[in-house]
């Protein structure tokens, strides 16, 4: 009978997030092993390489972030959905600082084409549900949308909030950042009215 695994994938990814917070993007598998209190062999039993560990950490962090963003995009009132999606960006980064830092590890397009082979497909499609939810919000917010409306919605609910919160990642994200992100989102998207 095989011995049960001492560490789950999530235990290892939690260790990777802790190692990243302590050692930065050059964290090693030895740093991850130290964070979980186990041998490096336990990690290599589950993951083929350091690159895969940190790619999987990025994917998990993005997935957790997307869960709240999908909820915000789906709010019935499209104007409230715009504000809530922007607030979610900073609130998530405040509530889960390790995941926020982990989300800075990779660019989706690069991971999808140059990342470990086993993660490329997942990375290529990680934004599919978010893109579909944003398209739905676009139609609710602008009944006859143009490409310019889509640009405004993307800028207001994704790019601007990311830019507002990014300087705070790795430290304390002040509560006022939520309101700043929401106000900027409403103003940017409102340019399409």
Question: What name fits each language-model region?
Answer:
Residues 95-118, 166-170:
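Amphipathic alpha-helical segments used for helix-helix packing
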Residues 66, 70, 112-143, 148-155:
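Amphipathic alpha-helical packing segments from all-alpha helical-bundle domains
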Residues 56, 70-98, 157:
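Hydrophobic alpha-helical connector segments
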Residues 11, 15, 22-52, 56:
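Helix-turn-helix
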Residues 54-61, 69, 103:
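Alpha-helical DNA-contacting segments of helix-turn-helix folds
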Residues 12-20, 61, 65, 89:
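Short hydrophobic clusters on alpha-helical segments that form packing/core surfaces
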Residues 1-7, 18, 112, 193:
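N-terminal intrinsically disordered/low-complexity leader segments
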Residues 128-140, 144, 155-193:
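C-terminal peripheral helix-coil segments that are non-catalytic and often amphipathic
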